[in-house]
């Protein structure tokens, strides 16, 4: 993600405070100059940058600050707070109501990725258990219905449109009525793309809006136009009641920071951001976690939400086995399935403190996914005895012929099968040691159930299993321990005050 360049530069500026022997006005000004330069390079409006600098300066009075206070943390906190303010419109975003029929109308410029974003939003809510559907009321662009139909079919989302009807108002009205009668909860209407000077298309947009009475009008914005987003968003807000904004193409443009801050300046809440072309390259936008991830400080709350989506608590049989230190090849297979359900690896890594959003490139991500699928293919060729044995690796070592059979069945080499078994053995050994830690699987606040010495042992085991580069990115053992503490607090629902500056 190109936005990661901005995150890297700001993080580098903040870290310069740690290298300074004395924190004085000169050090503060040098750091602020670096931060402001990075923001200007990301096309953030100069007035907003100037305001950020003034706000930090007024919040930090080095001469008046008590000697016992940690000046570095105070400055870092002030910068973090101002960065959050930069992308926060100060308006609560609209959210759909479960059990109700929520009609969402999409508007935006041509080429902003509106039709693709409609499908992404429908897929996002579908994965969360909502009954979603799509309506194509874009009769202006040739191929619009074909594109929506293709996206919807691929994601198995019901859709409505017409090749013969040319009146978007009729299509939208008929589609909404049809899906309301079928009790759909999220009804998404895609409209024709337009430019702000096209009065006829704006009139059409108003007619569609008046006909279907949407609960939420979403404006889709292309991040590549940077701070010009502000004028575009205002033009749309003047015509229709735009309640939310989705910013697309944040993965490929250096002006993303300018786009986000410009939208916030219009007092329109950003609800999602598009970070790639795939249907799951789509993330809910929350200001504080976004800035936290941008600066490599992670988003533990988001990570816990992802884990909770998998409903792992329902798997009582697995929890019971883990309590006794048992872990089979089938368990590993199921965990691989869960990892794939959580979405793109880069999104997950970005939520872990110490990792920037750029840690894993698209190429590496595809390679990792392919490797995971390959391991699952190998396990698909194993029989029940091999998958369900509490010591799966021993079953294969006693009868090496099994390795050859599995390799032939999955179309891989015997070495690939052996590598899988080695990986499984490491997992199984760790689970065995975790099973000896009383209170680890009780649920609730782990820090109350598990002693400090036991937690330290668990952290050491995790560190041994990790790739050294990964551990380094997390800030070594201290970073790993900090993440585990945050995860414990998050699991207990205590997310307040988690700023994560201790590893800066």
Swiss-Prot record:
Q: Name the enzyme group at the top EC level.
A: hydrolase
Q: Which InterPro entries match?
A: AAA+_ATPase (IPR003593), P-loop_NTPase (IPR027417), Signal_recog_part_SRP54_M_sf (IPR036891), Signal_recog_particl_SRP54_hlx (IPR013822), Signal_recog_particle_SRP54_M (IPR004125), SRP54 (IPR022941), SRP54_euk (IPR006325), SRP54_GTPase_dom (IPR000897)
* Region M-domain, annotated ranges: 296-504
Q: Which PROSITE patterns match?
A: SRP54
Which reactions does this protein catalyse?
A: GTP + H2O = GDP + phosphate + H(+)
Domain note for this entry?
The NG domain, also named G domain, is a special guanosine triphosphatase (GTPase) domain, which binds GTP and forms a guanosine 5'-triphosphate (GTP)-dependent complex with a homologous NG domain in the SRP receptor subunit SRPRA. The two NG domains undergo cooperative rearrangements upon their assembly, which culminate in the reciprocal activation of the GTPase activity of one another. SRP receptor compaction upon binding with cargo-loaded SRP and GTPase rearrangement drive SRP-mediated cotranslational protein translocation into the ER. The M domain binds the 7SL RNA in presence of SRP19 and binds the signal sequence of presecretory proteins.
Protein name, as recorded:
Signal recognition particle subunit SRP54
Q: Which organism is it from?
A: Rattus norvegicus
- Record gene name: Srp54
